[in-house]
Amino acid sequence: MKKIIASLLLLISSASVYATDDPVSFVKKLPYKQVVKDIVLSRCLAQVADDKSQFSLDAARSSNALLEWVPFDIENGNDKINALINKYKGATNAFHSERKPEVQGVTLNCLRLYYSDELNKLAPQLIIGNPDRTWIQDNPQ
């Protein structure tokens, strides 16, 4: 009997560990407007990387996965995001001291976009509802 009880307790404690191990819990805690900014950064990195690279594919899929946790205006949002990315991704960064012709500084362009006033203004507009809320606030358990 003691073995059965011990086994049940072990099973229950193991199940609770896996139940609380949510790999996207960090995303669910972020304000929607922050997740949109992260979507834009991921998408920008996907677009500036070699389109056949594993990194580009991973960044694109990460961007798409983040959309699962945001009430995103899909009809207007994608075009607005892509237009803003296109504005930033082609900038030339000639000021870098180690710049070689094949080095364009595209990661820097994506970071510049991420911290831009334009993205700070756009991100809340792409949310259906309150951009300061989080997924957890809107989906209590």
Tell me what each language-model feature is:
Residues T20-L66:
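N-terminal secretory signal peptides
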